[in-house]
């Protein structure tokens, strides 16, 4: 999950019944700041508020997990409050309560499980800062990435037969984010998502991530992870065409194309010394090509 500098967190202490509340740990980051579209104008307006309620819940839980000021104990306690509020056992966390009520109102209470899966990932973010191998990272992504796409598919009443392709794309997006932010995640939170065995195989060390230019071994480790990500994107290449809802299909096509381009960039550029992102013009160009391909396929 993407980190944030401690100074960007609100210093105000918001408490509920003398206990730290998630609202005290907000980063101020919104859906416009994410690396990929979140409920963009392409999504059916009927579904957009539901997806945004899920996003607000996930964003707040992510902020809690990534906060570098609150103690581990406090962060885990807040995440537990979010869980109990989502399941209806309590009402201590407003964003979780709003999400639960939104889902029940729209007959989507069966999708609450996706929020619970996300909370498992955020608990791991608090407690785990290294991943031994690719399989361990993929297991983490099963909770941190796949539930987001699965939720969107369920909201659109798409077939769960699409889940394998969804999981591949969502996992690829998560790994891309990890590689883009690998230096920041290490410096600010002592977190390394590049699997240890990949780094060890090429002689890269944790200290390499603390520099402002990637060493040759670290560049090799990043390239290895990026190549594995390309394999995930091959598995998701038919995803957008298989989606029944045309608007969602276009959005997924755009995301797939952006992910493919960013993965290629990560094999050629140093995320420690430069920002490996697309500017607005590049994003619009890629989006146009992807959208046209989906609409006229």
UniProtKB/Swiss-Prot annotation:
Keywords: Lyase. InterPro entries: HSQ_synthase_HpnC, Isoprenoid_synthase_dom_sf, Squ/phyt_synthse, Trans_IPPS_HH. Pfam families: SQS_PSY (PF00494). It comes from Zymomonas mobilis subsp. mobilis (strain ATCC 31821 / ZM4 / CP4). Gene3D superfamilies: Farnesyl Diphosphate Synthase (1.10.600.10). Belongs to the phytoene/squalene synthase family. HpnC subfamily. This is Hydroxysqualene synthase. One of its GO terms (molecular function) is lyase activity. It catalyses: presqualene diphosphate + H2O = hydroxysqualene + diphosphate. The gene is hpnC. Involved in the biosynthesis of the hopanoid precursor squalene (SQ) from farnesyl diphosphate (FPP). Catalyzes the second step, the conversion of presqualene diphosphate (PSPP) to hydroxysqualene (HSQ). Its EC number is 4.2.3.156. Pathway: Secondary metabolite biosynthesis; hopanoid biosynthesis. The keyword Membrane does not apply. GO terms for biological process: terpenoid biosynthetic process.
């Amino acid at each position: 999950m993407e980190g944030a500098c401690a100074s960007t967190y609100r210093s105000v202490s918001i408490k509920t019944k003398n206990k730290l509340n998630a609202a005290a740990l907000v980063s101020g980051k919104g859906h416009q700041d994410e690396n990929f579209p979140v409920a963009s104008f392409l999504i059916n307006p009927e579904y957009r508020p539901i997806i945004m309620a899920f996003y607000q819940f996930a964003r707040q839980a992510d902020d809690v997990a990534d906060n570098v000021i609150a103690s581990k104990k406090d962060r885990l306690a807040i995440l537990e409050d979010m869980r109990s509020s989502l399941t209806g056992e309590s009402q201590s966390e407003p964003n979780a309560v709003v999400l639960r009520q939104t889902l029940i109102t729209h007959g989507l209470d069966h999708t609450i499980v996706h929020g619970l899966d996300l909370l498992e990932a955020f608990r791991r973010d608090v407690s785990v800062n290294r991943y031994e191998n690719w399989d361990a990272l993929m297991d983490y992504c099963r909770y941190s990435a796949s539930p987001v796409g699965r939720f969107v598919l369920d909201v659109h009443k798409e077939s769960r037969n699409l889940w394998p392709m969804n999981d591949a794309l969502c996992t690829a997006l998560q790994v891309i984010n990890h590689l883009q932010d690998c230096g920041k995640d290490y410096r600010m939170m002592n977190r390394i998502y590049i699997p240890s065995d990949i780094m060890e195989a090429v002689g890269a060390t944790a200290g390499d991530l603390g520099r402002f230019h990637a060493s040759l071994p670290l560049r090799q480790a990043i390239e290895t992870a990026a190549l594995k990500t390309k394999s995930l994107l091959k598995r998701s290449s038919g995803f957008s065409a298989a989606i029944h809802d045309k608007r969602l299909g276009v959005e997924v096509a755009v995301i797939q194309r952006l992910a493919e381009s960013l993965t290629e960039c990560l094999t050629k550029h140093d995320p420690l010394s430069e920002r490996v992102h697309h500017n607005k013009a590049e994003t619009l160009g890629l989006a146009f090509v992807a959208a046209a391909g989906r609409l006229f396929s």
